Amino acid sequence: SCRAGCYIDYREFEDAELRMLIDGVLSSKHITAARSKDLIERICGLSNKYFKTSIKHIHSVNDWSKTDNNALFYNIESIYKAIEKQIQIRYDYNKYGIDRKLHKSSEQRVSPYQMILHNQRYYLMAYNEDWNDMVFQRLDHITDIAFTEKKATPIKNIKGYENGINYKEISSAMPYMYTDPPEQIVFR
């Protein structure tokens, strides 16, 4: 029999998939608590009206370890634009002080190549033009990004990257994204 009204016959995501997306947002250290709540609300909107009531852990967003850097999403957009345009960028690289706030550490001028999600952190893989070295810097420590007019140094011109980026090596040989060569140590 036909009932009057309308209904959605197909959904883009199943509820289990939406729960996985929500868990990813919750566990993401690089998304602020406020942004996490907003994203989770929008993800819940992709299902029916009963889905939100089945998600109990939404209200625990503030209990998770989250960044305070609200500029992260702007940083991601800006860096992607610079990578697409193949231009250098300048930014302030910061470190957390004992007051748990970011403090400017240095100004960087880099050729950006890739953003890498590793150990629940976003890193910028870039060639530091002043140090003449590849760097991996946490996106939540970057502020005040500015585009330059200079073209990015092609990655194939950098020693060790003539064949491009080896993601397998990066993820296994550099667990904390330090670029120094690995050294063997002996415990006695």
Set out the residue ranges of the language-model regions.
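Loop-centered beta-sheet repeat module
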Residues: 80-135
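Bulky hydrophobic/aromatic content
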Residues: 7-97
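Short, well-ordered alpha-helical segments in soluble proteins
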Residues: 47, 83, 119, 143-149
